Amino acid sequence: MGIQLSTIQTPQFHELFEEELPEYHNERSLGDSHFLRTFRMQDRKGYDVLIKVFVNKLPEISLSSIVNLLKEEQENISYRVPNAVPYIKTLVTLRAAYLVRPYVTHNLYDRISTRPFLELTEKKWIMFQLLKGISDCHRLGVCHGDIKSENILITSWNWAYLSDFSSFKPTYLPEDNPADYGYFFDTSSRRVCNIAPERFVPASQLQPAPLSPAMDIFSLGCVFAELLLEESPLFTLSQLFSYKAHGSYDLQSVLEQIEDKSTQNMILSMLDRDPSQRLSADAYLQKYRGTVFPACFYDTLYDYCIGLVDPSGILSAKQPNDACSLYGSRIDDIYRDIMPPNNNDISNLMHTPHEYNGIDSYSVPLFTTLDEFYNKNPAAKNWYLRLYNTMQEKKGFEDKEQGSTPAPSPSVIEDISSIETDENHLYGAAVLLPIVLSTIRHVNTRESKINALSLVQILSRNICDESKLDTVLPFVMTLLRDQYADVRISALITITRLVSNVTSIAPINAFLFQEYLFPDLQHFLFDMNSRTRATYASCLPILAKQASKFLNLAQSLRNAGILSFPESEYENINHGKAELLFETGRHDLVVTVERHVSTLLADSSSIVRRSLLNALAPLCVFFGKAKSNDLILSHLITYLNDTDWMLRCAFFESITGLSIFIGPRSVDEYILPLMLQALVDPEPAVLESVLGSFSGLIELHLFEKLVVVDILQLVLPLVAVPNAYIRRAALSVIYSAYQSFDDIDRDCIVTPLLRPYLMSNLCDINSLEKLDQFILPMVSDSVWSTLTRWYEESENSSFWKCDKDASYSSLDVSNDSLLGRTKNLQKREIMHHAEVYTHKKISLTGHVIITSTEMLELSEDDQKWADIIKEMGVDVKHLWVLANLRDYVKKTKINLNGINYKRQSGLRELNTYPNAPLHILPETIFWNPERPPSSSIANETFLDRNSYAESIQTSRSYNDDLIARDPIAYVGTDMTNAFGTTTKPKDVSQSDIKVDINRESNSDNGETITGTHDVYRQTDNPEIKLPSDTASSKVDTHNPTVTQPTDDTGGLNSYNTENPLLTNNTLEPSSVEAIVSSKDSDKHAKESKGKSLAPLISSRVSTNDTTNVAGIRSQRSFTTHIDLKKLTTRQNGAKKSSYTGTNPCVLNYLNKIYAEAAASTLNVGAAVSPSWASNIPLRRRTKVSAKAANKIVQTHEWHPEGSRVAQIYLGSLLDGGTKKVLVSPDSSFFVTLGSDGVVRAWQLVESVRHISTMRCECRLSYGHTRRNGERNRFSVVNGCFLGNTYAFASVTQDGSVEVHRLDVNNQRHTLISAGRIPNLDFSDSVTSMEASTFHDGSIRLVVVTKWSRIVYLDVGMMRVLSSDQLPLQCGSATSVVVSEGCNWALIGTTKGWLLLWDLRFGTLSCSWHMPARIDQMHLLLDVTKKRSNVNEYTSGNNNSPVTKVPGSSSTSSSSTQPINSTIPINPLENHGMLNSFGSTTVSISFSVLTNLDNKEVNLEDAVPASHRSASGIVNFDVEKGKTEEVFLENWNSSLTSPIPVSVGIDAFNEKKKFDIDSGNDMGLRDLNTKFDSPWPCISSPIYRYRGPSAGSVEREPLFLIAASGSPHAFIWNPHNVSASSSVTNDSESSKLSLIHNKPPIYQKVSEQQNVRPKSSGVSRPLLFLQQQKNLPSENRLHPIVDMAFLYQPYAIVLIVDAFGSLELWT
């Protein structure tokens, strides 16, 4: 036997892997076990796996049955046990067996001995997971068989996995032969035995048997003991035998080292010798809940972590490129769940309910003031006061004044984070913090990193100090050099808060600051971002304080013998050596902090210095009195010479804390003179800060009594300054001074000084409010302004004694007294002074206290000013108060001049040598005047838009958007260099520029409208002026004559009437110019080969007035010339310019400007007269000539005839039938949207021979562009016309938006813009869209979707301006209307909500609710406007005249022609259309399904008899919030009246308060469940004139209505109810009655309904005669789903039914 075994050779493993596991590579051996060899390898995707190999040296032994059984067990627990890692692959060959599982770096054995060591909370969390894992395995019938610390895997976030299931190993082992145990179980050769004692049996009893759960429980108990003891394992093999035989091994004494008695008892029970006495894993979990394991493990943390980290994901690892997003989403999820005001389990676990009110200490910035903190966090004030009061009570301040707001100091902010928390907080932090730390180095977005750092601040409050420094700090330090400044700032604040709460340290952290923190923080001194340096300046004092604290703790450790000395020869404690080391460390620390502070004090940014000033107190404590005087004070004095008033203000705000440390002498020598001079600072905020500092220093008794008296004399006049803050601060100084004296001094010194300023005698001053009531009031602003003018304008004045031009040397400098007399004044020019303040004791010049008006000496000039002041209400006896303010007025004026001079000097330093050559040659670049046709430009810009133009995110100012952007011919322009010097092109002079640009108008009389136009467009770059494009413009080189009115600046102001971006702007009447005769225009039009040129109208663009152009008001012209031969152009490509160089930067810039201008161009064509502007003509029954057709005069009102004249059927909705119909603005054609993705434009054509015969012709059709890989087009779901133009926007089901300019007569269309709504799910289709014109003339599109998203798009750039989610609880959005100017949009939903959305700010402004589903909405025009007899050009969205389609002169009897040959145009009054669009009245059609049996209805089935659809229309004024009229049909009297009721929007901000139907939140599937009826109620407003057409009459709206599910249409006349009639059923009998008066509610009840009649004697022509056989049966009626009204040539009602058929009715 032995000889045979010795001849078997073990194969080479790399050969085995290459032959049998070719998908794995890069093997690394992880051990030389005798039983299973372990290798770490990688698969083809790069993921690490662990492979266990058993080499079968005896081929006759089959391993298939064993491996198959193991495979079944692993498949049973795969993805079902979160705490188990099964084998993902098993393979058996003739040579070996392979077990493959995912590789995890650490196991429990390694983690126990790795720093930072596990805390008790983390150990309990791991124990809980292992019990849960083994319980799940046992429940599935799987036992492990070999549980030990090496077979328990631990991730970086402390998630535990049971791995290496060993059910294939023998269950029982011989107790007299340890070789079997060593071969199968002791793979690490540690001689550790966790095998249950019952598994060791005599050799005679060895037999195969299954594993039992009790065996795993014993092994798990051994692992628990090893985890808690952290020393040696619980059992070796010999100790286990002794324990089994009741030998000398005392288990209880070993487990007594565990402090928790409950944990001891649990482990003793698990290690019971009798297997029957051991409980199941689930029983242990239930028994020790609340004792060993906290309840939060069961209720919250375990399930939350499973959903967060997806433990089963280890079996199917994510792609490497998804790792960052995976970790980022994990961080963001935790942040959203923990941060208040969430009310979920995790948030409640980590925060005591209602303790913080949404504010926590981690949100308190270290470098902001208290006011800024309160403004950002409205609820913070009460929270801060409550915490501050709590801390003060702990410190013994019981008599703290209630309601006061203490200033936040860094020490207070430190203490806020140290609030005690309960046990749940500790366990929550122990579980969640490792998850955050494990992902913090893998996230790549700024938001996720900042969220992670915020979570670290929250969770680290609940862990021990050692974990803060050993576990958390290294992870946060990695973000100190992040690329984002916000992340670096957050990391620095996190580190500061982390170390500031440490109270005890381990010996390893004794030199943390000197060796670790400060070397890494040093780079913040030179960070490029000033905010980062400012943050470090605010954190440095706290870090210095903690560094000193750590130094003291290290000294204590040395004295205790815990921390050894650096030198090895000092074996015993040497206190002298320890003291020396302490002083050396202290000196090194001070030198380091001093270097950092000196750098920050001299920083160039005032923000950095202000941040350091806000935290001076800790630095003064750190440095001591001497160092504070030498280092800090010497730098701070220079701050007062800075022009930044906020820096000076911060200096005086911090001076009180600094004065405590430098002492009274330094205050008297250095601080007091500076404060006195600051009393005349020109900035009121600085004066307020100085007065506040005076008050604080007086309260601290840092001034002598005589100094306080002098300060009081200076401050008293300031109570009259017209500034409430200064007055309040001055009163505070007076009150503090009064309280600092005893009673005798008050009566003898203070009261005489106060008495002149008091309006009545005051016995005692016990409050500021009382002092404010009795002291003189402030002077008015007008008086103060007059006083200032008096000083500035008076020449010979006795009132102003000192020379007004006196410089700063006029201030008396005296070392003997504080208030000295005026000395000899020396005149100096202000510009010669570089300093605002001096550093010596000073007194205000000419300071003389005046207590009565008689002491004043006034000249004649002074008397005039005094009389003016008297007339303003100032009593004569109080003029002395103004006299005491003379010094304040004079010195503030002088100081202000000095500061302004310094600011100007700083600017001049940038250009010290203005005449020095810069060696930069300015170059003027011209655009080539030869431009391609508009169609090619449109195609080119469309192709370039997605590739380049959309990637340019260039912000423009409002005025820049007003400049024309249409392609146009461009000539020379001026160029401004970087220093503001305007240069002219040398080769082209301004006098050489002349252009002739004409345009032929489309008006009937052939009148040509032309004008001048600015050919320049100011870009964002001030150095270059670029042309704005107009595709239809061209330079006429034959007749170089054109107007060129210029403004004072030499530039040209333009107004392009073809520009869609200038719709709402007004021309100044004097600036409108018309030139060139019609003959020249005709000639030029021929030379241009039919290209109509845009009229060039030069004017100033008014940015305030939004009215449209009413017409041409001036015909004056100015001419200039241009020599096109001098223009150098490039001929290589479309992006042509005069630039001939090859500089790639210049070329890229020109390409960017060209692409941006082309992308923003949207030529929607000329505007047309809207059809509602004319009366509704009657249908002609007799033959009339075409000429007579133009002279039709209406003699009576229109009424529907009830005749169907045509029908269009393209197949069912599945085959491409009609879904929606829209009429062009002038009713010359209509557009149908098909379910096959095709848009078709139709015209009505009638025969001249047979007037009563009519047919429809499809003039053009086009389909939406297919995306790559798509065979069929998506259905076109919605569309709209862009203003009164032929530009049509449509959207498909996948969110693709296209804008086409339709030319129906020529059967052409042009794609002018295209895009796609982002993040639109296929099931979230567009339900409504509406276009409107913005204030700058650009066209905007508002789209709402089924899932209640509102998308706001710029049609020209085709980019999303905003995309917001409406409240899902309101239901699905069904319709939207948009106001003129795109200020607001009104959205209707399926649950009856009217949401008024502010498009400017993207917020919900107001809401109303009505008990019905809102189906359609229309913005009604202003019907009060009357017709005018004056012809007018009504401007469209591009400000061009109305296009009147000329009539046809054909009289052939056999010819057919478009019906739009006769369109009567009724002009409106000036700007009538704009005023109409300004209306706020909306017609709302609604429907509701009444459920009599309270049963649900399947909308796909027929509506049962117990359900009835009720519908109606309500006219609602959005501005007033009032209902004007209501129309109801089949309305149940038991239903609530459908009148919109206002609902506050506050409920939308709180998730729990917004459950309309029930108390539960609703998801997307519940959007359409309340008021859904099978079919919508369709309506369309119709406008007609009352009475005869002659004269000035009013228009009135009629409403075309199709009730919900009805096949018939009805006309409702709210002005004459009896005139209401049916359109499609003339035999219908119905009644309509008024049931309410306020508002009027009309109810229609049908008594009889017949089927729609057949064609009334007229033939029914179709789209294609070949499709006649596909017509649906006439007797089969379908509900109406859409309607429209065609005004011309006479009234036609377009009806779309649910089958996809379109019918035309008169």
UniProtKB/Swiss-Prot annotation:
Enzyme class: transferase
Chain positions found as Phosphotyrosine: 958
Domain of life from the UniProt record: Eukaryota
Pfam families on file: Pkinase, VPS15-like_hel
Domain spans labelled Protein kinase: 24-293
InterPro entries registered for this protein in UniProt: ARM-like (IPR011989), ARM-type_fold (IPR016024), HEAT_type_2 (IPR021133), Kinase-like_dom_sf (IPR011009), Prot_kinase_dom (IPR000719), Ser/Thr_kinase_AS (IPR008271), Vps15-like (IPR045162), VPS15-like_hel (IPR055231)
Task of the protein: Functions as a part of the autophagy-specific VPS34 PI3-kinase complex I that plays a role in autophagosome assembly. This complex is essential to recruit the atg8-phosphatidylinositol conjugate and the atg12-atg5 conjugate to the pre-autophagosomal structure. Also functions as part of the VPS34 PI3-kinase complex II.
Protein name: Serine/threonine-protein kinase vps15
SMART domains registered for this protein in UniProt: S_TKc
The entry's keywords: ATP-binding, Autophagy, Kinase, Nucleotide-binding, Phosphoprotein, Repeat, Serine/threonine-protein kinase, Transferase, WD repeat
